């Protein structure tokens, strides 16, 4: 049975105007002082949620639970299929086995899980290693925990692909006595999908210096080619050193419903994280969030397969259009996630523009992107491609006509 109001099984084509429907993505323009000029429709391409309906299996699971019992009393995970659904998903999508239910813990958010692991292994003022560019959620979480951020810059090779600088990482780890590193796998905001050998090398380097790894794998379902490699899966040592964070909220457009989970094989770390969460009553499972995950993971595989085709087409279209811009805007070839990190340095230098002016101009024609500077991209913008293909075509037509080729 289907409860979705959308006629099609998977509707990735309808342009959803979400203004006034409690959508931060649609109701907020993130560029201070910017506004959309009259005559241009809004094409929000900033914060990372999708302009697609969630999977029918998610709607079925939520409504099915409401129909089964309209009572929303105190809730327990037992009997929901929560653990089995997670293990099934990782087995089928990532070709890995999570053997023991106990290594899985409900988390109210990925960043909440990240924060707990930071607090387990470090004290206030201690350094935490991040890659740069980096996700703004990491910097905010580390700062909120009153720890010190140490950055290791990713380097771009001759093809523009972001690579880890292992020599620099080791230097930073030794000089700063790093005890915790945050790893984004795949990487946000660059969209880099790390190859297994890179993950292995990163883990080995951290193990060499007894650095604990927090691996944010919320984007792990958005791999354009091949399968995701969980950081904890590359070796037995990795299982002991890696605390991995996941959520179905990114994949199935459920960020507003809230809910995530961790996979932590280290018994001591897992116990301490649970103790910290208990102190604040933080990780109390949400009944509808859990049933949504079970519906997503048990029956949502086909939805994700079709979704990836749309994302891949959208990103490829944008990449192809940018190749006609004469090198003014650069990005690496899309590999994963549904965001791309656009480098406007050449454009700004040749046109005499500032990044503030570029962002204002993009918004003025309705293309609402995200300032890349908080992600440590000095002249960058992050674009979100989880929207109908027609919106991407229109957005990049406008950028070509009104930003790249126009005098302003």
Q: Where does each model-flagged region fall?
A:
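N-terminal small-domain helix-loop-helix segment of the aminotransferase-like
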Residues: 5-109, 116, 296, 406-408
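Conserved core of the PLP fold type I
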Residues: 67, 71-204, 221-222, 226-236, ...
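PLP-dependent enzyme catalytic core of the Aspartate aminotransferase-like
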Residues: 88, 350-408
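Helix C-cap/helix->beta junction micro-motif
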Residues: 145, 176, 208-209, 365, ...
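Conserved core segment of the aminotransferase class I/II
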Residues: 235-312, 319-321, 397
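Conserved glycine-rich beta-strand-loop-beta hairpin in the small C-terminal domain of fold type I
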Residues: 294, 310-319, 331-345, 379
């Amino acid at each position: 049975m289907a409860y979705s109001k959308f006629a099609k099984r998977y509707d990735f084509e309808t342009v959803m105007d979400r203004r006034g429907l409690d959508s931060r993505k649609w109701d907020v323009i993130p560029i201070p002082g910017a506004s959309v000029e009259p005559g241009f429709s809004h094409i929000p391409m900033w914060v990372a949620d999708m302009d697609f309906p969630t999977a029918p299996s998610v709607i079925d699971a939520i409504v099915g639970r409401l129909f089964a019992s309209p009572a929303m009393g105190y809730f327990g995970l037992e009997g929901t299929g929560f653990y089995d659904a997670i293990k099934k998903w990782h087995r089928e999508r990532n070709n890995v086995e999570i053997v023991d239910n106990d290594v899985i813990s409900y988390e109210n958010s990925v960043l909440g899980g990240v924060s707990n692991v930071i607090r387990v292994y470090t004290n206030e003022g201690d350094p935490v290693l991040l890659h740069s560019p980096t996700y703004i959620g990491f910097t905010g979480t580390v700062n909120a925990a009153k720890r010190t951020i140490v950055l290791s810059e990713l380097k771009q090779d001759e093809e523009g692909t972001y690579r880890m600088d292992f020599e620099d990482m080791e230097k930073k780890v030794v000089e700063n006595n790093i005890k915790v590193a945050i790893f984004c796998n795949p990487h946000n905001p660059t969209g880099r999908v790390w190859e297994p050998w890179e993950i292995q090398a990163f883990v080995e380097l951290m193990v060499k210096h007894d650095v604990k790894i927090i691996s944010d794998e919320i984007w792990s379902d958005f791999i354009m080619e091949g399968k995701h490699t969980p950081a904890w899966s590359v070796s037995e040592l990795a299982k002991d050193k890696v605390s991995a964070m996941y959520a179905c909220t990114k994949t199935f457009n459920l960020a507003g419903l809230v809910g995530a989970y961790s996979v932590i094989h280290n018994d001591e770390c897992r116990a301490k994280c649970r103790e910290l969460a208990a102190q604040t009553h933080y990780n109390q499972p949400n009944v509808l969030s859990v049933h949504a995950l079970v519906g997503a993971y048990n029956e949502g595989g086909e939805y994700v397969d079709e979704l990836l085709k749309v994302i891949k087409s959208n990103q490829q279209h944008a990449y192809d259009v940018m190749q006609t811009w004469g090198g003014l805007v650069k990005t690496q070839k899309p590999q994963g996630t549904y965001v791309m990190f656009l480098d406007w340095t050449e454009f700004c230098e040749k046109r005499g523009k500032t990044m503030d002016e570029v962002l204002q101009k993009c918004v003025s024609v309705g293309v609402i992107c995200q300032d890349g500077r908080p992600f440590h991209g000095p002249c960058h913008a992050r674009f979100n491609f989880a929207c109908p293909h027609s919106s991407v075509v229109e957005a990049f037509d406008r950028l070509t006509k009104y930003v790249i080729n126009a005098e302003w």
